[in-house]
Amino acid sequence: MNATPAVADDLIVIGKIYSVHGVRGEVKVYSFTDPTENLLQYKTWTLKREGSVKQVELVSGRGSDKFLVAKLKGLDDREEARLLAGYEICVPRNLFPELTDGEYYWYQLEGLKVIDQLGQLFGKIDHLLETGANDVMVVKPCAGSLDDRERLLPYTKQCVLAVDLEAGEMKVEWDADF
């Protein structure tokens, strides 16, 4: 394991190690990628937890019913693997595949100001949630917001009118009373 990770501002969280698997040092991983197995395409991971940062190399991985199982280079013991529980798995954003126009990674949407069709500022996108039907944006109030309410807005074509990453804004069709 290497202690010299990539620049922290360039790293995007794509998963989390949450437990050990078996007795040979494998770890159980929750993937934030879609599909979940995409996490296994990245061979070098930067692990972060409470100020601790380290780089590891993925040797192999496989899917299971509810999680991924990963084997990391130099990790051959269950007790060593247990120490990695709770670490976030990060990779540099420049390794992400290019998207087509109108497609965005969640990290690109987080922090955007959300403005309705009347020009009212609802707040900023704090994070997104994956639901069965569609993704949901959690919009928290910020300086200049219409009110101090947290809003949950669907990330759908009907709701999202425009995304302007340069301006840091998203225009939405949404009733302020919802």
UniProtKB/Swiss-Prot annotation:
One GO term of the biological process aspect: ribosomal small subunit biogenesis
Domain PRC barrel, residue spans: 100-178
The entry's keywords: Chaperone, Cytoplasm, Ribosome biogenesis, rRNA processing
Gene3D superfamilies noted in UniProt: PRC-barrel domain, RimM
SUPFAM superfamilies: PRC-barrel domain, Translation proteins
InterPro entries for this protein: PRC_barrel-like_sf, PRC_RimM, RimM, RimM_N, RimM_N_sf, Transl_B-barrel_sf
GO molecular function: ribosome binding
Cellular component terms (Gene Ontology): cytoplasm; ribosome
Chief location bin: cytoplasm
Localization of this protein: Cytoplasm
Pfam family, one: RimM
Entry text on domains: The PRC barrel domain binds ribosomal protein uS19.
Role according to the record: An accessory protein needed during the final step in the assembly of 30S ribosomal subunit, possibly for assembly of the head region. Essential for efficient processing of 16S rRNA. May be needed both before and after RbfA during the maturation of 16S rRNA. It has affinity for free ribosomal 30S subunits but not for 70S ribosomes.
Family membership: Belongs to the RimM family.
Subunit structure of this chain's protein: Binds ribosomal protein uS19.
PANTHER family the UniProt entry points to: RIBOSOME MATURATION FACTOR RIMM
Protein name: Ribosome maturation factor RimM
Organism field: Pseudomonas fluorescens (strain SBW25)
Source lineage: Bacteria, Pseudomonadati, Pseudomonadota, Gammaproteobacteria, Pseudomonadales
